[in-house]
């Protein structure tokens, strides 16, 4: 059994907890504590009721600073300084760092000094972390000595398995990416101040370009893709699910059927549970609450001149990523205990 704590109980923190109880991994992972500055009543309420993912199916209640889920008692903490958290006395194996604020090694080492054995960051990180992991692609690279690990981003988890499949089958020369991402809580409900002038605008009224370092994130996982990709990102007025428009130039000559067959075989083979494939005429909301990292929409595959391939990928940017946090944490402990 792994003892974990969640630091930051926002969209990803709550999705991790819910995913644990829905995924069948509760017999392997125990959430001992949650640290969040919000009041306990709000934490319970947002656990029970979620606009995006619906009602929590497990019984949950609150007694002072303890949230009970079924037979589990989870301590609720409200500490702003990570170094003061009681991870040593709680014997925490892994902290899920989900605040979005502690995203580099130096910041996350506060959890280690507080007594946690390892930290898994729910955010892309700088190169000084011990490893950046995309489960299904490079989780086998985890080592016992890795203390601070990044789970990359939802879009990196969506793209990298597909790029790896295409490169192994056809050799990728270059690529361009457009991420069509649902609105996030760093945007405004109505026009308000923000350092990014585009993010001063109402999230529900515009398609909003935002900066992205996605191409560099791909290189971190697949070094052979260095300088081969560029990416742009736009936020759209939906509350969940992301589409990715991926264009790649391949060495080998292909057609639509060949590309789709390779991707379908990957989804049903070694990437099963991480990659999906569909030919159904679906829209974004049909992928809400989908635990996979990436779903290929085979109906939208296009090939130009035998070498330029365009794909449409879907992912639930909350739920899929939360499930990968759980998967990666299990691999971290497996490496420690090997």
From Swiss-Prot:
InterPro entries according to UniProt? E4P_DH_bac (IPR006422), GlycerAld/Erythrose_P_DH (IPR020831), GlycerAld_3-P_DH_AS (IPR020830), GlycerAld_3-P_DH_cat (IPR020829), GlycerAld_3-P_DH_NAD(P)-bd (IPR020828), Glyceraldehyde-3-P_DH_1 (IPR006424), NAD(P)-bd_dom_sf (IPR036291)
Matching CDD domains, A to Z? Answer: GAPDH_C_E4PDH, GAPDH_N_E4PDH
**Record: residues binding NAD(+):** 11-12, 317
Active site per the UniProt annotation:
154 (nucleophile)
Gene3D superfamilies in UniProt: Dihydrodipicolinate Reductase, domain 2, NAD(P)-binding Rossmann-like Domain
Provide the site residues for: Activates thiol group during catalysis: 181
Q: Tell me which Gene Ontology terms the entry assigns under biological process.
A: glucose metabolic process; pyridoxal phosphate biosynthetic process; pyridoxine biosynthetic process
Write the Enzyme Commission number(s) for this entry: 1.2.1.72
Location in the cell: Cytoplasm
* A single GO molecular function term of this UniProt record: NADP binding
According to the record's subunit comment, the protein's assembly and interactions are: Homotetramer.
The protein's name is: D-erythrose-4-phosphate dehydrogenase
From which source organism is this entry?
Shewanella loihica (strain ATCC BAA-1088 / PV-4)
């Amino acid at each position: 059994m792994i003892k974990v704590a969640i630091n930051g109980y926002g969209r990803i923190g709550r999705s991790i907890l819910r995913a644990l109880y829905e995924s069948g991994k509760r017999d392997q992972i125990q959430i001992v504590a949650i640290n969040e500055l919000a009041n306990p009543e709000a934490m319970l309420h947002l656990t029970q009721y979620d606009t995006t993912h619906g009602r929590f199916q497990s019984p949950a209640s609150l007694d002072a600073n303890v949230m009970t889920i079924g037979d589990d008692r989870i301590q609720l903490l409200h500490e702003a300084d990570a170094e003061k958290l009681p991870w040593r006395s709680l014997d925490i194996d892994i902290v899920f760092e989900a605040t979005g604020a502690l995203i580099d090694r130096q910041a996350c080492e506060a959890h280690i000094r507080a007594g946690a054995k390892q930290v898994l960051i729910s955010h892309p990180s700088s190169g000084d972390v011990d490893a950046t992991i995309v489960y299904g692609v490079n989780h086998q690279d985890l080592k016992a000595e890795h203390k601070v690990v990044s789970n990359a981003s939802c879009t990196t988890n969506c793209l990298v398995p597909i790029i790896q499949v295409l490169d192994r089958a056809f050799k990728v020369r270059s690529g361009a990416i457009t991420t069509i991402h649902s609105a996030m809580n760093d945007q405004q409900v109505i026009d308000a101040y923000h350092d990014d002038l585009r993010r001063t605008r109402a999230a529900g009224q515009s398609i909003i370009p935002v900066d992205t370092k996605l191409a560099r994130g791909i290189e971190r996982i697949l070094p052979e893709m260095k300088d081969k990709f560029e990416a742009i990102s736009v936020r759209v007025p939906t509350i969940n699910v992301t589409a990715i428009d991926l264009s790649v130039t391949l060495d080998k000559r292909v057609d639509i059927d060949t590309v789709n067959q390779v991707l379908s075989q990957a989804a049903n083979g070694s990437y099963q549970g991480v990659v999906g494939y569909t030919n159904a005429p679906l829209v974004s909301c049909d992928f809400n609450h989908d635990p996979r990292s990436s779903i290929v929409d085979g109906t939208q595959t296009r090939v130009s001149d035998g070498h330029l391939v365009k794909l449409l990928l879907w992912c639930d940017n909350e739920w899929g990523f939360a499930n990968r946090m759980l998967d990666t944490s299990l691999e971290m402990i497996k490496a420690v205990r090997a």
